[in-house]
Curated annotation (Swiss-Prot):
Protein name: Amino-acid acetyltransferase, mitochondrial
The entry's keywords: Acyltransferase, Amino-acid biosynthesis, Mitochondrion, Transferase, Transit peptide
Catalytic activity from the UniProt record: L-glutamate + acetyl-CoA = N-acetyl-L-glutamate + CoA + H(+)
Cited Pfam families: NAT
Record-level GO BP terms: L-arginine biosynthetic process; ornithine biosynthetic process
Main subcellular localisation: mitochondrion
InterPro entries found in the cross-reference section: GlcNAc_Synth_fun, Vertebrate-like_GNAT_dom
GN (gene name): ARG2
Pathway note: Amino-acid biosynthesis; L-arginine biosynthesis; N(2)-acetyl-L-ornithine from L-glutamate: step 1/4
Record localization: Mitochondrion
Length: 581
C-alpha cells in the first residue's frame, strides 16, 4: 500500500512539473507573439533563440545509456555543464560531442555586452534594471556587464577602488540574493586584462573566467581594472577600451557564442539629432550616416562636454560594430544606447532593449516624420554597421544626368537593377519601354547595399509645375522585413526631395498602412485603382482649403495641388508586363 502511495505521489509530482514546463513554454511563446508585430519577426526570434530553452519531455529514453546521454546533451544546460567540467580540467569541451556519429547541434551562447555608467542611478531604477536582466535571461540572452567609472579622477587608485567596492556591493544588493529563487545570479570580476606595453591594448588573460559563469547562468560584472605588466601594478583603464578588447576576443569564439547586442547604459541617452530637436536618433545606419552625425555633433547645438561623451559612445559603437561585421561576415550585431531609467522600464513593448531582442529593430520606425506630433520623442538610439548607400542626382554627376549615362559609366548595373525590380514586384519589367520613359526625367537614383534595395525618383510635369514622383521603391524579397532597410531608403528619398514628393500605390497594397504613417495626406477617386500619397515641406505652410479665404503668398492651394497630383499619377503608364513570362 505504501508503495502505491509513493507511486501515486510521484505521478502527481510529474504532472505538476509537466504543467509548470508547459505553462512556462506557453507564457514565453505568448509574450513573444504579443511583442512581435509580424509572423516573420516571431519566426526569426524563435529560430535564433529556441535552443536556449529547455522545454523537453520529462521522460528520457531508457532503451540504452547511449541514448540517454545523447538526449541529455541536446539540452542546453546539460551541454553547458559538460563544457564547464572540461574547461576546469583543461580539456577540449567539444571532443566527442559533435562528431559525425551523433551529429549533435551546438547550442551557442547568445551574448549581450552591457556598459553601465554609474552616475545617479537610484534604487528604484536598479530594481527595474534587475527585472530587465531577468527578462533578458528568460529570453535566451547571456549578459556580460562592464562597470563604467570613467567619470572618476585617475590620480588615486586606492580611493577609486574603495569607492568601486562600495558601489558594487550596493548593486549586488539591488539585484537580489543569488541563493533566493528567482533572483539573479551574479559575480564580480576584476583584473581580467593585461597590458603588456603602451603600443598594445588590453588583452584578456583567461576568457574562461567569463565563459564558465555564463554557462552556469551567472551574469559577470567586470570592473575596469587591468594588470600593467610593465609597472607590475593594477590600474584603471577606459571602459570603452575593455569593451572593444573583450568583444574582439568573443568574436573569435564563433563555435561557442554569438555577440548579439552591444548596449551602453548612459544617463545622457542616445545620440542627439538636430532634426528631432535634440532627442535621439532612432536608428543609425553607420555605413551611411556616421561621418554626417559626427559633423552634426560639432555644429554647436549641445555643450562641448556633452558632445564629447556622445562622440565617445558613437565612436566606440562604430569601431565595435565594424569589427563585429568584419569578423562574423554579417550584420547581426546591434548597438543600443539608452538611459538607466529606460532600461528599468518593465514592458516588452516600451523597453527598447527587450523589444530589440524580440524584433531586432527600434520601438518606432526611424522614417516616421519627426514633425508629426504623433511620433514619439526618444532617448534611445539603435545602431547597425548597416549597408552602403549610393545616391545619384544631377548635383553630384558631371555629365548630363540620364539613366543611360549612369549605366554607360558603370555606376549602375542595368541587369542587376532590372533583376531587383522584377524580384521586388514579382513581375517582369518592360525594360526598354520603362528605361526609355524615365531616361531623361530621372531626378534621383538610390541603390542600397549589393542591390538589396533601390529607389527611382523622376521629375513629372503638370502644366509648368515640376514635381518629384517616387516611381519605384524596391526591396529584394529576401530583405523584405529586414529591420531598418525600408526606413534607410525612405529617409534618403525624403532628404533628396524634402520640398514636395508624391507617389502612388494600388488601393489593395498592404504596404499602404506604412505609407499613411509617412505622408502628409492621400487621395483616391472611386473609379481609380490607385491611392495617391503626398508629403513635403510645402505642407508645413498654411493650406488654402477655401479659395475665398485670403491667405499669404506662400500658402498652398490644396485643391490645385490635388488636381496636379491626380493628373500626374493617373497618367503614368504601367512599367511591368501584365503577367510573369
Amino acid at each position: 500500500m505504501s508503495k502505491l502511495k509513493n507511486l501515486n505521489r510521484e505521478f502527481i509530482s510529474n504532472l505538476k512539473s509537466h504543467k509548470l514546463i508547459t505553462d512556462a513554454k506557453r507564457n514565453l511563446i505568448l509574450s513573444i507573439l504579443k511583442s512581435t508585430t509580424t509572423k516573420r519577426e516571431a519566426r526569426n526570434y524563435l529560430n535564433k533563440y529556441q535552443n536556449q530553452f529547455d522545454f523537453g519531455d520529462l521522460k528520457i529514453s531508457s532503451s540504452a545509456k547511449y541514448e540517454q546521454d545523447v538526449s541529455k546533451l541536446t539540452k542546453r544546460d546539460s551541454q553547458r555543464e559538460l563544457f564547464v567540467n572540461r574547461y576546469l580540467n583543461k580539456q577540449n569541451p567539444f571532443i566527442n560531442i559533435y562528431d559525425d556519429e551523433t551529429k549533435l547541434k551546438k547550442i551557442p551562447l547568445r551574448v549581450a555586452l552591457f556598459k553601465l555608467k554609474f552616475l545617479n542611478i537610484d534604487p528604484k531604477e536598479w530594481r527595474g534594471i534587475a527585472e530587465t536582466f531577468k527578462r533578458l535571461v528568460n529570453l535566451g540572452i547571456s549578459p556580460i556587464v562592464f562597470l563604467d567609472y570613467d567619470h572618476l579622477p585617475t590620480d588615486s587608485f586606492k580611493y577609486n577602488e574603495l569607492y568601486m567596492i562600495n558601489q558594487v556591493n550596493k548593486v549586488m544588493n539591488y539585484l537580489g540574493k543569488p541563493e533566493e529563487e528567482g533572483n539573479l545570479k551574479t559575480t564580480v570580476l576584476r583584473s581580467l586584462f593585461t597590458v603588456e606595453n603602451k603600443e598594445r591594448g588590453p588583452v584578456i588573460n583567461s576568457l574562461e573566467s567569463i565563459l564558465i559563469p555564463l554557462y552556469q547562468g551567472i551574469i559577470p560584472f567586470i570592473q575596469p581594472i587591468i594588470y600593467n605588466a610593465e609597472s607590475t601594478f593594477q590600474q584603471f583603464i577606459n571602459s570603452n577600451q575593455l569593451l572593444y578588447s573583450l568583444c574582439e576576443s568573443l568574436l573569435d569564439k564563433k563555435d561557442l557564442l554569438s555577440v548579439e547586442k552591444i548596449v551602453m547604459i548612459d544617463p545622457i541617452g542616445g545620440i542627439p539629432s538636430v532634426e528631432r530637436n535634440q532627442t535621439s536618433h532612432v536608428f543609425i545606419n553607420l555605413s551611411q550616416e556616421y561621418s554626417d552625425i559626427v559633423s552634426e555633433l560639432y555644429i554647436g547645438h549641445i555643450e562641448p562636454d556633452q558632445r564629447d561623451l556622445h562622440l565617445a559612445n558613437l565612436n566606440t559603437m562604430h569601431e565595435i560594430l565594424t569589427l563585429a561585421s568584419s569578423k562574423s561576415g554579417n550584420d547581426d550585431t546591434t548597438g543600443i544606447i539608452t538611459t538607466p531609467f529606460i532600461m528599468s522600464v518593465n514592458d516588452d513593448l516600451i523597453n527598447p532593449i527587450i523589444y530589440n531582442v524580440l524584433t531586432d529593430r527600434p520601438i518606432i520606425s526611424s522614417s516616421l516624420p519627426s514633425s508629426n506630433n504623433r511620433t514619439p520623442q526618444l532617448s534611445t538610439s539603435i545602431l547597425k554597421k548597416g549597408v552602403d548607400v549610393r545616391s545619384y542626382d544631377a548635383d553630384n554627376y558631371a555629365r548630363k544626368f540620364t539613366l543611360h549615362n549612369l549605366i554607360e559609366d558603370e555606376l549602375v548595373d542595368k541587369n542587376r537593377l532590372v533583376a531587383l525590380l522584377d524580384d521586388s514586384f514579382g513581375k517582369n519589367l518592360d525594360t526598354d519601354s520603362y528605361f526609355d520613359r524615365i531616361n531623361n526625367s530621372l531626378a534621383t537614383l538610390v541603390i542600397v547595399g549589393d542591390y538589396d534595395g533601390a529607389a527611382i525618383i523622376t521629375w513629372e510635369y503638370s502644366g509648368t509645375n515640376k514635381i518629384a514622383y517616387l516611381d519605384k521603391f524596391a526591396i529584394a524579397k529576401k530583405n523584405q522585413g529586414l529591420p531598418g532597410l525600408a526606413d534607410v531608403i525612405f529617409k534618403i528619398i525624403l532628404s533628396s526631395h524634402p520640398h514636395e514628393l508624391i507617389w502612388r500605390s494600388r488601393k489593395v497594397n498592404p504596404v499602404n498602412k506604412w505609407y499613411f504613417e509617412r505622408c502628409v495626406g492621400s487621395m483616391s477617386s472611386p473609379e481609380s485603382q490607385w491611392r495617391i500619397f503626398y508629403t513635403g515641406d510645402i505642407f508645413n505652410r498654411r493650406i488654402d482649403k477655401r479659395r475665398k479665404r485670403i491667405v499669404g503668398s506662400e500658402a498652398v492651394n490644396i485643391s490645385d495641388k490635388l488636381v496636379q497630383y491626380s493628373e500626374i499619377c493617373e497618367g503614368i503608364p504601367p512599367s511591368f508586363f501584365s503577367s510573369k513570362e
